[in-house]
Curated annotation (Swiss-Prot):
HAMAP family: NDH1_NuoB. It comes from Geotalea uraniireducens (strain Rf4). [4Fe-4S] cluster binds at C37, C38, C102, C131. NDH-1 shuttles electrons from NADH, via FMN and iron-sulfur (Fe-S) centers, to quinones in the respiratory chain. The immediate electron acceptor for the enzyme in this species is believed to be ubiquinone. Couples the redox reaction to proton translocation (for every two electrons transferred, four hydrogen ions are translocated across the cytoplasmic membrane), and thus conserves the redox energy in a proton gradient. One of its GO terms (cellular component) is respiratory chain complex I. This is NADH-quinone oxidoreductase subunit B. Belongs to the complex I 20 kDa subunit family. NDH-1 is composed of 14 different subunits. Subunits NuoB, C, D, E, F, and G constitute the peripheral sector of the complex. Its cofactor is [4Fe-4S] cluster. Keywords: 4Fe-4S, Cell inner membrane, Cell membrane, Iron, Iron-sulfur, Membrane, Metal-binding, NAD, Quinone, Translocase, Transport, Ubiquinone. It is found in: Cell inner membrane. InterPro entries: NADH_UbQ_OxRdtase-like_20kDa, NADH_UQ_OxRdtase_20Kd_su. GO terms for molecular function: 4 iron, 4 sulfur cluster binding; iron ion binding; NADH dehydrogenase (ubiquinone) activity; NADH:ubiquinone reductase (non-electrogenic) activity; quinone binding. It is a peripheral membrane protein.
Amino acid sequence: MGVEQPLGDNIVTASLDGLVNWARKSSIWPMTFGLACCAIEMMATGAAKHDLDRFGIIFRASPRQSDCIIIAGTVTKKMLPVIKTVYEQMPEPKWVIAMGACACSGGVFDTYSVVQGVDEALPVDVYIPGCPPRPEALLYGLMKLQDKIGKERNSFGSAIGLGDRLEPAA
C-alpha cells in the first residue's frame, strides 16, 4: 500500500485499491485439498517451524471461509468434479495454487484416469513445482500469491453505486 500524500503527522491518504489489496493479501485463508504426497509437505508448512500465521495465512476446512485453494497431489478424473464443486463454493475473490508436479502437469502419471494439470478445469494463479515440493517452496508460492494480489486492479464503482461507468455523470 503506497502512501500517496502525507497530510500532517497523523493522516495518511492512499488509494482504495491499495488498501483493499493490502487487506486481502495480508489475510489469505487457504483451503487445503491434499490428494497425495504433497499433502504431507503442506501440513509441514502449517507447522510451527514455518509459522504461516506471521504472514496472515490460516488454513481453513470450509470452502465458504476460504479465499484460496491449494490443490496438492494427483488429480484424477473422478476427483475433478469434486474439486470444481469446492471451488464454486468459495466466495469471490478466490485464487488457486497448484502444488506439486501432479497438480501442475499430471506428474509421472500419463494415463487416461489422471488429469494432466488442474489448470484444465480451474484458473491456476500460482504453480509450485516439485515432487513433492518442500515446505519452503509452498511458502514462496504463497508469498508470490500475496504479491499478485497486491498488484490487482479492482473496480469498486458498483459498490458505491457508479456501476461500470468510466465517465462522470452529467
